[in-house]
Amino acid sequence: MIRPKVLFLCSGNSCRTQMAEAFLRDMGGDRFEPLSAGAEAAEMLDPDAVAAMLEVGLDISGQQPKRIDPFMRERVSYLVTLCEREIERTCPIFPGAFWRLKWPIENPATANDRDEHRALVRRARDEIREHVIRFVQEHS
């Protein structure tokens, strides 16, 4: 059975798309092939994203930020952007997708201080989890 590829894209691939990839891997089982990338790959995962995912029982510490470039020639069934395009000018455009979905999740990097950043990461995590739940229900 060929699993549909689901590519999650954002600006840096350090937080939101990493969480989405992990949630789909967990909730979708072997029904999907989750991937994630960013216009620019961050140097490392956002430590607050790693901590927030551990709070819900998922360990993303072994995942690495990836640039979109290696995926540009791939065909994917679903492209999911997690950017607020109006704000994030670096949100990538991807030509090889059959279906395109937009989940406008606020970028925690816009936080003014560490406490606000942690709160935004948790809110993003919870919003992404709800989106993934609906995605799995609608596309399984």
Which residue stretches match the model-derived regions?
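Short polar/charged helix/loop
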Residues: 1-140
